[in-house]
Structure formats: C-alpha cells, structure tokens
C-alpha cells in the first residue's frame, strides 16, 4: 500500500523549543485505504520493527465533510500547550506526560486536581483514556516503579488500563488566562497584572489588581469564602482595614511574600501561608487571607474541562471531557 502525506505547519502550537509542530494528513484518495489498514496495538509494534518507522495519523472517523476526528494523547497535549505552554513551567517542575504514549487514542478525558489513587482507579473504572491533573503524578525522579507503593500502584493501574496521565502544573499557574487569573477573577479583582514578573517571560506567578470599591478586610474575607465555596478560611490583620488592592497566588504562596510586601496591595490571598508570614504581615499593617492549597486551586477542574471541550470541538475531534467530582480537601476542620 502506498500512502502520500502532506505536512502542514501548525504555527499556533509550537513545541518546547518554539519549533512549529507538523500535522501529518493523508491526501484524499488514500484516506479510505489508511482507515481500512489501521493496525491494532500489536500490529503497530510489528510495523515499527518491520519498517523502522512509526507514523501517527489523525484521520476522520468516517469519510465526508464535517465528520469528527479521532484524537490521540499527542493531540490533547498540543491543545493543553496552547492553554498552558510547556516552556512556562518552572525548572523544578515536572509538568507534561507522566504515563502513556502520544499515539494512544483518546475518547474520554478526565480532569482532576490531584492524581490520587482513588482518582486514578475511578478514571480506569470509567474507561477514561486520559487523566489531566494539575499536580504531577511523578514529581521527583523515580529510582524504581514498585507496585507495593502508592505511586507504583497508580502507574501499574494506568498502564494496565491504557490510561495516559498528563500534568499541567506551574505552566497553568503562570499562563495568561491560567489558574492565577481564574482565582483573581473569581474573587472580583479587576485590572489584573502580574505580581512577580520577569522581563520577556509573561506575568509570572501571582497576580495583583483592584477591587471595584474599597471594602473592610472582614467583608472581603466573607466575600472570598462565599465565592470560593469554602467552609472556612484563615485571616490575618485588622478586620476594619480598608482594602482596595489585592494580590493573589494559587497553591503555596509563601515564596511571594516578598513580592507582596514590595507591592501596594493591602491584602494577599493564597494558601499554605506560614506562622512567621502572618507575623510579618501583622507587623507591616497588611492582611493575609489563607484559603488553603486545595481551596485556591480546585477551581481549575471545571475551568480546564470547559476549555478542553471548546478546543476539542473547535478542532473537530471526537472526545468527551468529564470532571472528577469526588476530590476533597485533605484537611479536616473540627
């Protein structure tokens, strides 16, 4: 069988080094031939050995205009990188593909905050093909994959069920329209800009902006609690302090305390803030609102799922996106 291919550069989706990715398409006359010859996994492996090359094709699921296309893990990674470019990730981070292969087909996607054992098991039971999480499954280098450990069991289950796992971590935190922007918008901040910026590298971690009108700190805290759907939060500062400008950082924001103190914001909203951070803010006449790590980041699940649905539909792929609805904050308040 002879297949003719044409390459079309997708300039909107660069890879890590900024080089445009190529999207390989089969010319019209050969589409039906390629569709009839799609190999299963074993035949694909044999083809690799026999021909010393492997080609992944995204072809329409049926001939004719307007038909949806089958998606692969690689296709979804390209979509995720338009939302949260990989090059934005911090050097210490391990965002990207955690388990699986780019050529694996994807018909169902799960979105979750954490790759916890119960999340991975549920995704497998629901026949998901791709699990997209904020926090990486493999954060530190693994010396071995031991199925007697929690992470080993998750890797084993994912591979056994052919569930790919992809993380969008600090790149989603930093990206424009990403997690920090989502948090700032949710609590009502306007005129949003970067809190910890680097020249030529986008807005960086954290955001800062204005409230529509000044409010008392106690009223701001109650507003945040309501808008974020929280049972509780921690507040530092004079409850009557007038707040007109607010800084935020999702997750653990302690590393941005210096940027907060250097700014003109009266309050800083984040999670995992420490005792001495609280004392420093108290002494400086500033305010802290600690909404917890989970509380500041869980909103990414619904938001990212919706972005994925929009991009999948826009590109003509056929893949369902579901949100994991069972996650809970690991901290319990008595």
Describe each PLM feature range.
Residues 4-12:
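Hydrophobic, low-acid, alpha-helix-prone terminal segments
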Residues 3, 23, 30-33:
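Cationic, amphipathic, low-complexity segments that mediate targeting or membrane/lipid association
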Residues 5, 53-54:
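Aromatic (phenylalanine/tyrosine) cluster motif
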Residues 57-334:
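Hydrophobic structural segments
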Residues 34, 55-57:
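Cysteine-centered motifs
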